[in-house]
Each structure stands twice: as structure tokens, then as C-alpha cells.
Amino acid sequence: MLRKRFKRVMCITSVLMMVVGSLGGCGGQKETAGGTTAPVEEAAAEAVNFPLADNYKFSIMTRVASDSEQDFSKKALVQRMEEATNVTAEYKAIPEEQFDDKYKLSLSKSDMPDVVTKMYIKPYDILGYAKKGVFIPLEGYIETNMPNLKKVLDARPEVRASITAADGHIYTLPFVNEWSTNSKENINVIGAIPYINVTWLDQLGLSMPTTTDELKIVLEAFAKEIKVENGTVVPMSFRINQVNQDPGISLGAFGCGDNMDHYMVTNDKKVYYTLAQEDARKGLEWLHELYAEGLVDPEIFSQDGATYSAKVASGRVGLFYDWAIGLAGDYTDQYEALPPLAGPDGTINIPRQNYYSFDMGVTAVTSACEKPSVVCAYLDQYFEPSMSIQNCYGTYDDPNYTNVFTQEGDMLKWTEEGAADGKIRNDQNLYDCFAILSDYYGVYVDRMLDSDALRLEMVSTIYSPSITSDFNYPAAFMEQKDITRISEIETDLKKYAEQVKAEIVKDGITDDAWKTYLDKLDQMGIEELITLKQKGFDLFYELTNYENAGQGTTAAEK
């Protein structure tokens, strides 16, 4: 069955690929004076028809989890792709904890791999490798050799904009994993969700709190009335300034709230910094009030992830913040998501995180690659809808591993084991080149992964209606000089702002101290920082008509 799908995909690919020119000159770096390298000029792409008459091999470096299959040649997807294309992808799988160091080292050598994937790098590094002639431009190959990816980029202009450098070139291939075309409903529009112990609420005869004042009353009751056998009750816990465990979502009851990089956008498209806003101060002072009364865990400033997880899983925390309710372990059934709270003046707002349904810097083809057209055409097979799902999660009819899916006609259906166990998925998947759009569910695969579907329902029904901002800060691909300047300012400024954020929760802040803090932000360059971030937002908006990004056509309509 998979062979039939492969043949159908290959046939479509061959028909769509038009000859643009010869392959000559498409490999190798360009030497400049002094022995340095310069960007590789874009080469003409060449039509490719699979299966090739003669076998072609290319090398690809990737990362792998320590508990999953290390030998990618044993994976059914890799074997089936070779059979269908007559292209051998020679994977060099590097353990997760060593990958970042090893791929950087490999890209500094003359015998670098043809492809490096699962890098997850940002524009500054992408442009750095491009200027050295390590990464080659890919937009010509996308147009000629990658019809599946092109279809996705045409349907999602925000993804195309995010991978297009200021010089007009595309140097890396993304992955896309989308759960909704409504950006306010995607599962990553917010990060940490507050989960409250409803068993304790029922035990005390209390209703779900709807305001910040009511939450304080509930936390006081937890502290005074609840007894546990395995330690002391912790009414409220989180990890300040830590991804997906920070309480910034609850600060929206006082205005803008907070997110992990502290950039937000007003509905008239103005970028601002949350930790320089008066209403963010009010929210932090509310947390200080709770902290001063002993209602907030004193370890919020210092506990690591393992300590926090163990504490929540012990069942003695009344309210905790995390991406997933499952952090509560055996006590998960006792918790529910805390709905958006109204602040003292009635404000209800859920702040957006600047998370995206794609990653811009996943896969690059290097100047060592002798036949980029063949390699890009090969990688494009994984951007076909059904293949994308298998690349991301795993496959079916594999006699050597527990299967993630079965297949009925063109529909993939989750197995019980595949849906439940990430290791089973990692043994079969590649998780590098894929694009899963929200309209694929129910067409190419029977349903979402259960945990994603649960979070999507939670976000879309409980939190999305209270998201007041129409924009998050996008994945803007800015000029290298602007990226450099942002980094220069942001490194110290963000560290200082987050330090003061934690200090306010612990000790509160006076008007004079707040003014001193704002003056220090000015001295550190916050005005220039926001100007540069605004420039990036405006550029992205111009490229994508961002107001409608991701909400129009489907890939199938292109």
C-alpha cells in the first residue's frame, strides 16, 4: 500500500518538475581573497524523475533521542524511500545531548555532510552559515523540485516569510505542525496553563474562582483547611521566568499580562515590552501580595524542573502552571484548567505567547552536496500530506517495530500503542521534513494525537475567547545587523527585567523604585530595541498580509 502511495507521489512530482537549467556549478563554496568563503551563488535547478536510473547517495546528519532507534537505515520510512527513489540517504544520527556541538563542528570542516537537519537554529546563525558559503540558497529548488513544500508555502505565506532572508534567499527548510487555522485557537497560542485542584474545591464546598479576589480566598482556604499525608500543602506553585511554567497568563487580569520573551503587539500593530508596562507591575504586585501571605511556594525562584515536577506529582499543590495537566501524575484527575480571571477593574485578558506552528531553521543543504536538485526532490516527498504525518509520528506495516498507524485506503489510523507511547513513535519517525496542516485531520489521518486534541479543546473553549490581541510577534527574518543589535541590547536588558520581575513578586516595589527601573531600561536601550522589533513586525506584515496569515486557503486548494 505504501509503495502505491510512493509511486503516486513520485509520478506527480515528476510531472510538476520543469527544467530550469543545468546542474552545473551547484556545489562547493566560492573562495575569496585570504582563503575565506563567500555565499554560494544560486544554481539552476534540474528536473528529477524518480526512481533514478543510477543510485545516488547523500549524507544527512540528524539528532536522535537516546532511548530510540539509533540506526536510521533500519527505519521503514528510510527503506521505502530508497526503494521508491533509488536514492540512499546515509543518516549520521548524533545523540541529542551531543548534537549541537557536533553539527557545528561538522559544518566547519571540508567533509561536511550534504544535509544537516533538526538544527532548530535562528536567523543570525542561518545568515552566518550562508555568508560563509556553507548553506546554499534553496528557493530555486523549492520552485522546481519541491512541489509539495511549495504548495504548503503558498497556502501559508507566514511560513514562507519566516524562512526568507532579507536578501531574498531561502537557506533552510521548515517543519510545520498546525492544529488550527485560527491563530487564537492553536494549542501554542499560550504556554503555561493554570491547573487548580477541583477535588479540594469540592471538599471545601467552594466554586471555581472567577476573579483574582476569589482566587485569593480559595488559596487561603487551601492553606488553612486542606491536610495531606505526604508533606505540607502548597497553595500555589510555579517557576518564575521559566518556559511553560511561569504565571504570566494570570497577569492578564491586570492588563497586558506577560509572556516568555516579553514582546506583545497591540491591535493597531504597535510592538511593546510587557515588563515596562504599568499594568504588568500591578499583576506582579498581586503575586507579591499572595507571596507575602504565604500562599505562593517560596521555592518559585529556585526550584528546577525535576523538583517542581515531583512536587506537583505529589498531589499537595493547589494551583500549578504547566503546558500539560499530566504533570500532576497520579493526581491528574483532581485538576482542571482555571478559567480566565477578572481583575480588580473587571479586566479579562489572556496574553499570547510568541510561539509558532512551525520552525524556520530545521534543515539545510550544504555546499558539499553535489546534486541539490536530487536531494531537494527527495526531501520533498516527506512534505506530501500522508508522508508528513508519517515523518512526524511514525508509520505502519513495519515488521520490526510496534506500529504507530494502520492504514485503511488513504487514511492513517492511530494504533493504541502509537498514540500512547512517544518512544514507539520515535523508533519509527524521522521528525525532520514535514508539514501537517490542520485540514489534514480527518482526511489523511483519523484524528489528532490525543494530548494535542485535549489541549486544543481546552485552549479554544476556555482561553481563546479571552485573547484580546489579534497579533503575536511573528517569526520575522530580519537583516543580520538588526539581529545583532537586538541581541546586544536584549541580552542584558531581558536578564535585568526578569530579575526585577522576580524581585517584585518577592519584595514588592515602590513608585520610586519602579521609576528607577524604567530609567535603567531606557539607559539599556529599550527604545531602540522596540524600534528594531517594530521594523521586523512591519516587514513581516508587508510580506504576508499578516492580518489574514494562515486563515485563508488550504494547501489542497493551491
Where are these regions (language model features)?
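Short, high-confidence coil segments that cap the C-terminus of an alpha-helix
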Residues: 111-113, 231, 316-317
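Extracytoplasmic/periplasmic substrate-binding proteins
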Residues: 127-128, 241-265, 288-443
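Helix-loop-helix "hinge/cap" segment bordering the ligand-binding cleft or interdomain interface
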Residues: 139, 169-170, 174-245, 265-311, ...
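Conserved small-residue motifs centered on glycine
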Residues: 385-508, 551
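Extracytoplasmic/periplasmic ligand-capture domains
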Residues: 4, 75-91, 105, 194, ...
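Bacterial Sec-dependent N-terminal signal peptides
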Residues: 1-13
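C-terminal motif of bacterial Sec signal peptides marking the signal peptidase cleavage site
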Residues: 21-25
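Conserved N-terminal structural module of periplasmic/extracytoplasmic solute-binding proteins
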Residues: 8-11, 26-217, 261-263, 272-273, ...
